[in-house]
């Protein structure tokens, strides 16, 4: 299983014949060069969304049409886009599990907000969520944008993810210290990968507090468009 950071909260996850684009933000992403867009998206089979804020979905509709791939995400938003945008969607909700290519994806809670812009102004897009992704005998937790929450207790106990992708840049999500606390208290990760940081000056620029707070855990600071073998 191979993971590639696209900057901010975006990732490319490759497993078997399946390539998931998770919250891919390309246009306007200061961390990703325009010349890297094709490599970031080529061969994708599905798009997986945690919520509808612009820095997670700005390119999603165009990508889904260009690549002819389904968008997988929260039921309310998928239903709306399926009706209004003519894209393939797979909508489900918290507690649900769907087969996405070679993976099994379970939707879990997050603690954030979830709106998107339309010609008529802001519109709510159902709940913000995270995912537990099972592939190649491993379980990977994608937190999405979130703060620490009590739900992490049962999520860690029930799904037992070995790998955590945690939004940890602060201001809009938990920061590195909070992410370390959540990981240590609620999960038994072997590997943690921070994201949603370094993008803007108001976000944290280093994962050192996460590293310091998780002795014995393999904390990987991702680099743009560089492979991480999981």
Curated annotation (Swiss-Prot):
InterPro entries: Metallo-B-lactamas, RibonucZ/Hydroxyglut_hydro, UPF0173, UPF0173_UPF0282_UlaG_hydrolase. The keyword Repeat does not apply. It comes from the Bacteria. Keywords: Hydrolase. GO terms for molecular function: hydrolase activity. SUPFAM superfamilies: Metallo-hydrolase/oxidoreductase. Pfam families: Lactamase_B_2 (PF12706). The keyword Hydrolase applies. SMART domains: Lactamase_B. PANTHER family: UPF0173 METAL-DEPENDENT HYDROLASE MJ1163 (PTHR43546:SF3), UPF0173 METAL-DEPENDENT HYDROLASE MJ1163-RELATED (PTHR43546). Belongs to the UPF0173 family. HAMAP family: UPF0173. NCBIfam families: PRK00685.1. This is UPF0173 metal-dependent hydrolase TM1040_1920. It comes from Ruegeria sp. (strain TM1040).
